[in-house]
Amino acid sequence: MAPNQRPKVVITGASRGIGRGCARAFGTQGAEVVLVARNLDELQRAVDEIVSEGGCASAVACDVTNAEEVRSLFGGLERCDVLINNAGMNRPQPFLDVDLATLDELLSLNVRSMFIAAQAAARLMARQHSGVIINMSSQMGHVGAANRSVYCTTKHAIEGLTKALAVELAPLGIRVNAVAPTYVETPLTRPFLENEAFRGEVLQRIPLGRIGTVAEVVAAVMFLASPAASLITGTSLLVDGGYTAQ
């Protein structure tokens, strides 16, 4: 990267929640942020927010489960310094009731799309001999849980992908890590956390006794993307209030 050049940061799932929080944080710190999601209207509102605060941002409508769209997106970039691989979803179901449509949808979005985005970004980063990839995992990538067989499968896969890429891409100057949050107040989790019984059960499992915030997850992402983490690769930073320590 040339002196005084803004680092280019690509964030998938950037229209809301953790992705949007990351976009705003990178934007306020001087990065050129490319926000990626399917809903262009929501993306544009996020871009407008960043620009109004003096940041540099653009929106790209892209279905990350479509390999050609993802490759076209990265093919149109001159460089990529950081990829925040954040798009994902959850659909809790008892294991005996899991239908193939749910299995395929979560594998496609939570695993396949992240693999393809990481590959496309890494091809750019390899030319630069530098770059950072951060995969959004979950505490469920470290444990098991009832009604989350598919989600746990996908997040354990992301933990494995992170380690494999860290080893393979290190000689190319590319660091790869994961961030693994506990339950965080986002549009994705809100329907579950509004159930008082479920919320109480969750809080009982978290030693620090509270739900996480977007800002706390964003802080972990910003650290792993920063020079302060220059010797860190192949790890998963748990932001879970002690959930997995038990």
What are these regions (language model features)?
Residues 96, 143-149, 171-172, 209, ...:
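Active-site loop immediately N-terminal to the catalytic Tyr-X3-Lys motif
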Residues 94-95, 99-107, 202:
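Substrate-binding pocket helix/loop in short-chain dehydrogenase/reductase
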Residues 115-118, 175, 210-239, 243-245:
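C-terminal substrate-recognition "lid" of short-chain dehydrogenase/reductases
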Residues 15-17:
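Conserved glycine-rich cofactor-binding loop
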Residues 138:
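Residue(s) in the substrate-gating loop at a strand-loop-helix junction
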Residues 123, 167-171, 230:
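Alpha-helical segment proximal to the catalytic Tyr-Lys
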Residues 118, 154, 162:
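Active-site helix of classical SDR
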